[in-house]
Amino acid sequence: MKPLILLTNDDGVLSPGLAALAEAVQDQAELLIVAPRWQQTTMGRSFPRNDSAGTIEACDLLVGGMKKKAFGVTGSPAQAVAHAVLEIADRMPDLCLSGINYGENVGLSLTCSGTLGAAFEAFSHGIPAIAVSLQVPLHHQHAADYPAMDWRACQRVAAVWVARVLAEGLPPDTAILNFNIPTGADHTTPVRITRQSRRSSSRFSRPEPRPWQLGFQLHSEPDPLLDQAESGSDIHAIHFEKVISLTPLGWDLTTKEGTP
């Protein structure tokens, strides 16, 4: 029996990035494709509560020119994973693959990331996870019209590392392998093991004076101090060295110092 891979994302079940990821690994495993019905970027590992949350709709995703069955879940990426594991899957997935995300997931933004939120939810069910994200301009990161991207470098990374994890498992104390692929990467771009930066690649800008009784969405802008990102970090790797960043992430958030 082939292994079962749960594919998900935070950009929505019809995202070309999700289809590209499925195409990259479809020969290695049976695929269960379950993702939010709509764009859910920056939802983290949240579980919103509303009357429509948890509704599930089957749909077709075009993968390599062929239709594959997928499921859209009304809710966050983490909710999609939970419903996939608890209701849709007929057996426990061997691996969760989250992406390919429009926009890098690095530094302090990791806790905001729906891509990583889905991966952490999978690991909470005992499923190892890989997250794959492509560096794109900020204005594309929340887009629901899915601008065209070159996914090939991301697909190569996914295919190689999925095979490796299925064969060998994750390294000790690792919950997720977090891959970030820089703009312009190709088959010659090396992979570098990095650590999570203490900076962010973007920040919220201060709003102009406005009536507080009206709804408002904070806007992001590039971090003007990005060049202060630490050497050896995920941000430094993709923004300045232009290499593929691989950050092994753990589940335990406890600090090493200051604990009894």
Residue ranges and their predicted role:
Residues 149, 166-168, 172-260:
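C-terminal accessory domains and tails appended to enzymatic cores
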Residues 32-34, 71, 97, 128-132, ...:
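Hydrophobic/aromatic beta-strand patches that form the interior of the parallel beta-sheet core
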Residues 2-5, 19-87, 91-92:
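A cross-family phosphate/adenosyl-ligand binding-site feature
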Residues 123-146:
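Glycine-rich phosphate/pyrophosphate-binding loops
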Residues 11-19, 211:
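Short acidic, Gly/Ser-rich segments with clustered Asp/Glu that frequently serve as metal-coordination loops
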Residues 84-90, 117-128:
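Alpha-helix C-terminal capping segments
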Residues 113-119, 142-165:
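Active-site glycine-rich loop that binds ribose-phosphate moieties when present
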